[in-house]
Amino acid sequence: MAHKKGLGSSKNGRDSNAQRLGVKVFGGQLVPGGSIIVRQRGTKIKPGNNVGWGKDDTLFAKVTGVVEFRDRGRMGKFVNINASV
């Protein structure tokens, strides 16, 4: 058995925090304006009507309304907000 720790062992033992990405609000839910809908890296889901696009690719509601996800085939997946009256 070794009586010393070894060269690499004391340099190990770190881990980064989770980034907490993903869909935060699902289809059919009512959201207030300004709330985050999706946190993502890249444009996995694209912004549609009444949805804003943050500099870190976060999608957020511009107006109060109901969330709707649509898959438009080759064009990709989109999220829309159907504004409530």
From Swiss-Prot:
- A GO BP term, please? translation
Pfam families given in the database record: Ribosomal_L27 (PF01016)
PROSITE patterns named among the record's database cross-references: RIBOSOMAL_L27 (PS00831)
Give one GO molecular function term.
structural constituent of ribosome
The record's listing under SUPFAM superfamilies reads: Ribosomal L27 protein-like
Keywords annotated in UniProt: Ribonucleoprotein, Ribosomal protein
**Is S-adenosyl-L-methionine tagged as a keyword?**
no
- Which stretch is the leader sequence? none
Residues that span the membrane, as ranges: none
Q: Which domain of life is it from?
A: Bacteria
An example Gene Ontology CC term for this record: cytosolic large ribosomal subunit
Please name the InterPro entries in this protein's record: Ribosomal_bL27, Ribosomal_bL27_CS
By sequence similarity, the record places it as follows:
Belongs to the bacterial ribosomal protein bL27 family.
Which PANTHER family does the entry link to? LARGE RIBOSOMAL SUBUNIT PROTEIN BL27M, RIBOSOMAL PROTEIN L27
Q: What protein am I looking at? A: Large ribosomal subunit protein bL27
Q: Which species does the entry assign this protein to? A: Solibacter usitatus (strain Ellin6076)
